[in-house]
């Protein structure tokens, strides 16, 4: 497996270190609750992306009204502090909605099925996984990855709203980034690209079953790490460009 995915010396060394950290589980403990809740959390997160996109455009809906826009941009701090406050409100709403929704879903799921096997190694389910995590740690990583996806969706919706001046277009295009790109599955020409699309943030559990690694110069990282880092970084320019657009009154 190391020879298959380690196409360079650096990748092979990285895979060796990762597999060396994995401890062979000496006993089995049922972890059905975490195995079921993980994919369900991903699907629920995708639904929250749509809801957050809808609420995001709602925050700036008044600026679509010509009379409201005139008043908003004629004030001293409307184009600056006002725009910044509204953008901040978008991410506060997204954060509160995502974590409250996930907390409620987790309480309902684990309340009914229990939390047995939380500290069991994921190797009991995926023997060839290079991640030395237990089921609880993997679940928390699923939630973190989904949170990054929701923030990125909110940022993209803001940016698209500035450029298209249409709430429907902004929501539709943003949601298609997560729900439409998976339709490329099975097309070999887009396979490498599809593995790094935003929707993969909701496929942490599947990504962990594949020891695929990426190399940038001397830096080697796993797909899960790359996805979280990539879209956390891309969130920054979406916010900056959105702020500049609202500040200039480009709407």
Model-derived features with residue positions:
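Membrane-helix interface linkers and caps
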Residues: 64, 70-71
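Transmembrane alpha-helix boundary/hinge residues in polytopic small-molecule transporters
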Residues: 67-68, 155, 171
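Secretory targeting signals
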Residues: 1-63, 84-163, 183, 207-216, ...
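Transmembrane helix irregularities
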Residues: 75, 163-164
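Short helix-to-coil transition segments within interhelical loops
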Residues: 73-79
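Membrane-helix interface/capping residues of multi-pass secondary transporters
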Residues: 79, 166-167
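Alpha-helical transmembrane segments and their immediate interhelical loop/hinge regions
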Residues: 68, 83-84
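Terminal transmembrane helical anchor/hairpin motif
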Residues: 27, 116-137, 168-172, 177-249
